[in-house]
UniProtKB/Swiss-Prot annotation:
GO terms for molecular function: structural constituent of ribosome. This is Large ribosomal subunit protein bL17. GO terms for cellular component: cytosolic large ribosomal subunit. The gene is rplQ. PANTHER family: LARGE RIBOSOMAL SUBUNIT PROTEIN BL17M (PTHR14413:SF16), RIBOSOMAL PROTEIN L17 (PTHR14413). HAMAP family: Ribosomal_bL17. Keywords: Ribonucleoprotein, Ribosomal protein. InterPro entries: Ribosomal_bL17, Ribosomal_bL17_CS, Ribosomal_bL17_sf.
Length: 131
């Protein structure tokens, strides 16, 4: 029986699943928005929300925990310098998952995952082109 097992296996071994979710977490922190399948997006939310909560408290122990989960020094620096202060007053709910329809090849449900309260880059582009 599968009762009370909340983990999605995503048809992968545990090491592949861990590596995939770690890579997706680093990509989301780097670009602040990614496109993926809906089940992967929902599982990514379970991984990245506690990491973003770690970034709100700047301590050596939290930095070591974040590095242990991310394995990317540049993203740990961004997490504590930029993202932690941005979400200091928000208690969870750091991600927005938007459904995007279905993938052409296999009809898999797709999702757009982005960090909430991310700065708009389109306004800066429009301001530069107007000058």
């Amino acid at each position: 029986m599968r009762h009370r097992h909340g983990l999605r296996k995503l048809n992968r071994t545990s090491s592949h699943r861990l590596a995939m979710l770690r890579n997706m977490t680093v990509s989301l922190l780097r670009h602040e928005a990614i496109k993926t399948t809906l089940p992967k997006a929902k599982e990514l939310r379970r991984v990245i929300e506690p990491i973003l909560t770690l970034g709100k408290t700047d301590s050596l122990a939290n930095k070591r925990l974040a590095f242990n989960r991310l394995r990317d020094r540049e993203m740990v620096v961004k997490l504590f310098a930029e993202l932690g202060p941005r979400y200091a007053n928000r208690n969870g709910g750091y991600l927005r998952i938007l459904k995007m329809g279905f993938r052409v090849g296999d009809n898999a449900p797709m999702a757009f995952v982005e960090l909430v309260d991310r700065p708009d880059t389109t306004e800066a582009v429009e301001d530069n082109s107007g000058e």
